[in-house]
């Protein structure tokens, strides 16, 4: 859907599942189950389609601005049938923040569409683009209920080559369940470093381990 906030989908909190190292929600009215997990440098997404569709689209939006953050330049391109490479430079939360990425797809898209919105630095440079906001649309045809597509996106603050190295080191496959289990195991190990006595009230245990979890992700 198109709205003032940009491309979006409705959801209900009733469909959410949130655990250490895992998040899931159903996008309505598309009936798409979204699941997220991660390694240290790789974000892993799985989209499961809950009904048949002639065509579905996964959108990589590098042109998106939210609150005080804005794109000042970006790029994204298919470096292979199952790999997307690019970068996003932004301003706002951090000045001239540079993030490079490589995304591995569990299956190639039938078609990829790329749009680039030019950015103009000032009124004195009308017509001179100093950067672009890029959006990639990945189209998949004849998707059946229960089918999934997994994306593994590695990040680097140094270069696209660095992002590729991180992907190769931490995401050699596209098995979402294996990444989720690994994340759960790591969180269990970290959170178990401090054990409360068995007579600690459940409410205090919840408060303590929630605070410990938040401290670990900072």
Which stretches of residues belong to each language-model region?
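Beta-sandwich/jelly-roll carbohydrate-recognition scaffolds of carbohydrate-active enzymes
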Residues: 1-218
